[in-house]
Design a protein with these regions (language model features):
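Canonical tetratricopeptide repeat
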Residues: 229, 529, 567, 601, ...
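Alpha-solenoid helical-repeat scaffolds
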Residues: 364-570
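TPR alpha-solenoid repeat register
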Residues: 526, 564, 598, 632, ...
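Structural motif corresponding to the intra-repeat A-B loop/turn of tetratricopeptide repeats
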Residues: 16, 504, 537-541, 575, ...
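Single-residue signature of alpha-solenoid repeat helices
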Residues: 22, 510, 544-547, 581, ...
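Residue-level recognition of tetratricopeptide repeat
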Residues: 35-36, 219-223, 490, 523-524, ...
Length: 726
């Protein structure tokens, strides 16, 4: 068995609480990959397990047995986790390199020393103000440069530390993350490192730390990073087996309705992040062309220049300038509205600006933007304190990662900008979409820009394959489907989140969400959403309920609900249960007697039941009221075919087929009409075109309307000859 498979099988045994098999699995692994420390730890676990078994088999009833067994299971998981972490680091060149960097630093990684270093930095920054002005800037650069290096290595240490945290380390790190004497930027970066480490390998101590920081943090930026951290670190498979404490931690949070609302917002914001590429395509295809063609700038070999105004333009095209401005403003406003709704409108542009050397450093993808970052200070020294740049970094609608990109790109293009525009920038007169302070400080905004930082990392970092991507389709982004939230207070918000995913047409995700509902929460809206899913989801075998069941259950709760009746009618119709469909559409017509779709489907049900006279009466009325409605004409034509009125049907089909976009079923049904009226060659031509469009086997022509063919007197030899022609 391969190494990965061996470690995977050990986890499967742990999940199944099969302690003995898990011990044997690790013993087999350590036989192939000997390590004295791990072997000693495993031997101690086996010894304790044997003592427990010996005591039990002698007939003693130990009330502490369940807790002792659980403790052994957790000790074995910790050992397994340490081995997995070491294996992952040793078999990935990137992870090995950052592990070696922090390992070779020879620093004291105890939480006490980390706290002391962080507090000393804050003190040194304060002392800077007492330095003579001629020395202050040089010392500032030196101080921040050394501190950023130290934070980079600390980030690497947290990520690649071979051992899972003990409870003591977790409590001490929690103190650091909540301390008012530690810089918030440092706390935010540490939280991101803890999150990234926990996503790679679940660590209950780190998870507990993130939950506690989310509960207790005063700084909203630290708090929101902790929220995202524990959510993305959730591992539902471990809940009931190895660490039931995870349930208690999460359920305690869910007692607060504000926490539940934040989780709803977070789930929706994650999805908006995942639409970044699609939103970029929309902007590039539909919005940017309008903005570019209406602007008065042009690119030259010397950079951007203002285009000269044509004095004849106002004479030849009066009002054209105003029209262009209105069109450009409308395009820009559309982009602003996309951003307000949660779209990541800047991903496309800034995704091309992640090749600066700054982004080679792992922790720089997570560090909050601050002007004293050594790389930023270097740029500001070259460009000067540009007011435009300052305002954009303070109030611009960008995530931290994009702010860094903006600064480095700004340095490269500033010399190519026209002089008059450069003057505007230096005076701070040309800023873009500044955000008010209250929005910048809001929890929702802080969380959104952090998610955008994460999305850029997992999509653009060159070594991203070394990490578990939560934004993948099978990643942890769909946390509302985690079993830990089932049958909790959060279920009160399940319908809102599921409806959101339905609007996004993410049916695969909707199925997972609906599967997480407890039976007590299967209310009217649940059955309506599941019914919609059942009628639109391709993989029927994955569904727990059929659309017929769902709409029937919904109507038991609200008997005369129009949408539920409409869903039930469709379910009957799709199953060719035309009598039941007819009865249901009849009920709908008592509620909405003039609704065209109900009248049309009522007539279609009559047609399929062979009640052609009644069907045609309604269809003629609909055709009179809606003469250009193709759906009405389509059903009318087919009813005429069934009634034997082929000439009238053919006229309608000729109209339907005289368009650029031919509906394949019109070819098929016109073919039947021609065949029944004796125009075999023309019928075969229609069938040929239909089969080519749909890529069906010729047998479909006979199987699709086998009953009608017999009713129309088409003999078996005639049917076989048609197949011969096809």
């Amino acid at each position: 068995m391969g190494t990965i498979q061996n470690l995977k099988s050990v986890f499967d045994y742990l999940e199944a609480r099969n302690l003995g098999a898990a011990i044997i699995g690790l013993e087999n692994y350590l036989t192939i990959h000997p390590n004295q420390v791990n072997s000693d730890r495993l031997h101690a676990i086996r010894t304790d397990c044997q003592l427990m078994a010996d005591y039990w088999k002698r007939g003693f009833k130990d009330p502490q047995l369940p807790s002792l067994f659980q403790a052994l299971l957790q000790r074995l998981y910790v050992l397994w986790g340490n081995i997995c972490r070491s294996y992952a680091i040793g078999h990935n060149s990137f992870m090995s390199s950052i592990y070696m960097r922090q390992h070779m630093s020879a620093r004291d990684w105890s939480p006490q020393n980390i706290l002391e270093e962080l507090e000393t930095f804050v003190s040194n920054v304060a002392i800077l103000e007492l330095e003579p002005s001629q020395q202050r800037e040089a010392k500032r650069r030196e101080l921040y440069c050394q501190h950023q290096h130290d934070m980079n290595v600390l980030f690497d240490h947290i990520l690649t530390s071979a051992d899972l945290w003990t409870d003591g380390i977790a409590m001490a790190m929690e103190e650091i993350l909540l301390s008012p004497t530690v810089d918030t930027n440092d706390q935010q970066l540490i939280v991101s490192a803890v999150m990234l480490s926990s996503m790679e390998l679940f660590d209950i101590a780190k998870f507990r730390t993130l939950v506690h920081v989310y509960e207790k943090a005063v700084d909203e930026r630290v708090r929101q990073r902790a929220l995202v951290g524990w959510v993305l670190a959730l591992r539902g498979r471990l809940i009931a087996t190895i660490y039931p404490e995870q349930i208690d931690l999460v359920h305690h949070l869910l007692e607060d309705e504000d926490h539940c609302k934040e989780l709803v917002e977070l789930q929706e914001q994650i999805v908006f992040c995942m639409h970044a590429e699609h939103d970029t395509e929309t902007i590039q295809r539909e919005i940017m062309p309008d903005l570019l063609k209406n602007q008065s700038l042009r690119m030259t070999r010397n950079g951007i220049e203002e285009a000269e105004e044509d004095p004849m333009e106002d004479i030849l095209h009066p009002g054209e300038q105003e029209r262009k401005l209105e069109q450009m403003e409308a395009s820009f406003q559309r982009m602003v509205n996309m951003q307000k709704q949660g779209s990541d409108i800047y991903f496309g542009g800034f995704s091309q600006m992640k090749r600066f050397s700054f982004f080679n450093e792992l922790s720089n993808w997570f560090v909050p933007f601050y002007p004293n970052h050594p790389d930023v200070m270097e740029v500001l020294e070259k460009t000067g304190m540009n007011r435009f740049l300052n305002v954009m970094m303070e109030k611009g609608p960008f995530c931290n990662s994009d702010k860094y990109s903006f600064v480095f790109a700004f340095q490269q293009v500033i010399s190519q900008i026209p002089q008059n525009m450069r003057g505007m920038l230096e005076r701070g007169e040309a800023t873009l979409n500044e955000l008010p302070s209250e929005e910048l400080e809001s929890a929702a905004y802080i969380r959104r820009i952090y998610l955008q930082d994460l999305y850029r990392f997992f999509r653009l970092f060159p070594e991203r394959s070394a990490f578990v991507n939560p934004f993948d389709m099978d990643g942890s982004f769909l946390f509302f489907a985690d079993p830990i939230f089932s049958k909790t207070h959060l279920e009160l918000f399940f319908n809102d989140v599921t409806a959101f995913f339905l609007k996004q047409d993410r049916l695969y995700n909707v199925l997972k969400l609906l599967s997480n509902y407890g039976e007590a929460r299967r209310d009217f809206q649940f059955w309506m959403m599941y019914g919609y899913l059942a009628q639109h989801y391709a993989n029927e075998s994955a569904l727990a309920f059929s659309d017929l069941q769902c709409y029937t259950n919904a109507l038991e709760i609200q008997p005369d609900h129009e949408r539920a009746l409409a869903g039930l009618a469709r379910a009957f119709f799709y199953r060719e249960m035309y009598k039941e469909a007819l009865e249901t559409y009849d009920k709908l017509l008592t509620i909405c007697p003039d609704k065209k779709s109900y009248r049309l489907n009522f007539a279609a049900s009559l047609t399929n039941l062979g009640q052609y006279d009644e069907a045609l009466k309604e269809l003629y009325r609909l055709n009179y009221e809606f003469p250009d409605d193709k759906k009405v004409n389509r059903v009318l034509a087919w009813a005429l075919v069934c009634e034997g009125k082929y000439e009238a049907a053919d006229k309608i089909y000729e109209q339907l087929l005289a368009t650029d976009n031919v509906y394949p079923d019109d070819l098929l049904n016109y073919g039947y009409s021609l065949w029944f009226s004796g125009h075999v060659d023309e019928a075969a031509d229609c069938f040929h075109r239909f089969l080519k469009e749909e890529d069906y086997d010729p047998d479909f022509i006979l199987e699709n309307e086998a009953v009608l063919l017999r009713e129309k007197g088409i003999s078996e030899p005639e049917q076989q000859l048609m197949l011969y022609l096809l």
